[in-house]
Amino acid sequence: MAHKKGAGSTKNGRDSKPKMLGVKRFAGEKVNSGTIIVRQRGTHIHPGENVGLGRDYTIFATCEGVVKFEPTTNDRRKVSVVAD
């Protein structure tokens, strides 16, 4: 048996923590102002009415209402909040 660990096992053994990206509030859900709707890297989903876009492309509600996803041109999606 080898008495050394070998190059592979000593250089492995680390991983980055999960980033928790994705849709946090789905279509039809009620949200308050400031609620995070989507966490993303880049604008996979674009902001629509009554939502804001953060520095890290997080989409959040700017008013109280119901989440609505809708298609736009060129296979893009847009998320809006429809006020009650």
From Swiss-Prot:
Named from the GO MF annotations, one term is:
structural constituent of ribosome
Ordered alphabetically, the record's keywords are: Ribonucleoprotein, Ribosomal protein
**What is one Gene Ontology biological process annotated in the Swiss-Prot or TrEMBL record?**
translation
Q: Does Heme show up as a keyword for this record?
A: no
Question: GO CC annotation: what is one?
Answer: ribosome
The ranges of region (Disordered) come to: 1-21
Coiled-coil-forming residues are: none
The superkingdom of the source organism is Bacteria
NCBIfam families listed in its UniProt record: L27
- What family does the Swiss-Prot or TrEMBL record give for this protein? Belongs to the bacterial ribosomal protein bL27 family.
Protein name (Swiss-Prot/TrEMBL): Large ribosomal subunit protein bL27
User: What species is this protein from?
Assistant: Dehalococcoides mccartyi (strain ATCC BAA-2100 / JCM 16839 / KCTC 5957 / BAV1)
Q: Which gene encodes it?
A: rpmA
